[in-house]
Amino acid sequence: PSKKIGVIIGMEGIMQLEDVNHLQELFDKGVRHAGLTWNEVNKYAAGLSSTTEGLTTLGKDILKRMEKLGMIIDLAHANPRTFNEVFEATSQPLIVSHGNTKALCNHIRNYTDEQLNMIKDRNGVIGICGIAPFISDIEENQTVAYMAAHIDYVAKLIGVDHVGIGFDVCYYLGEGETQNNVEGFQNIGDANNLFNELQKLGYSDDDIEKIKYKNFFRVFKEILK
């Protein structure tokens, strides 16, 4: 097997795009993934800072171009209205690169069963992340075992083919800032702790491989041209 390492260049929000035409320039420089917003409201879409606004006309134009170019569309940080309207405006598989399930933790960045089923119906994937407040609002549950429980919940709800990992490990957030990850998963070096928890829950090696990378890889192969 090939031992080549692949990297996807992505953008966590496109608020800096001055106009729709700049997307082509970014694509030409290698960008193959983007979310429309990082929580903020911008000229293309609304993130979680708004409860009322959604996808704009310019946002619909961007989505059309992303689909035509073969770019991965990421719904992480989009608010519920934008989430729904992106589904209405597109036809390709969609991803949430990092986020968890509201059923286990009712955090604003997590997703309802209805949203998870929408991802499944579009043959997409959600990546479960290890940020402690996204895992549980009860401190003793902010563990790698409960992170595995989020994966297990999603797998049982929409199928193991639609859940992956979106660790969202940030080694630098800004001067004096630190990220609060769950106990047992403080950095990428702790990844095997998560996989061990999945084994304890009865997941096969094949299913763990899907969760590790194969599910996202399936979507990438379908979209990227």
Predicted features and spans:
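Extended, charged catalytic domains and RNA/DNA-binding interfaces, predominantly
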Residues: 1-129, 133-135, 148, 152-155, ...
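Short, flexible active-site loop motifs that bind/organize anionic cofactors or intermediates
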Residues: 13, 106, 181, 198, ...
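Hydrophobic alpha-helical scaffolding
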Residues: 76, 105, 109, 140-144, ...
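Active-site micro-motifs of SAM-dependent methyltransferase domains
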Residues: 101, 171, 218
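Conserved active-site loop/cleft motifs that coordinate metal ions or position small ligands
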Residues: 127, 163-166, 207-212
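Short glycine/threonine-rich loop-to-helix capping motif typified by GTGT followed
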Residues: 140, 175-184, 220-225
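Short acidic/histidine-rich active-site segments
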Residues: 158-184
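Mid-to-C-terminal alpha-helical segments outside catalytic/metal-binding sites
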Residues: 186-225
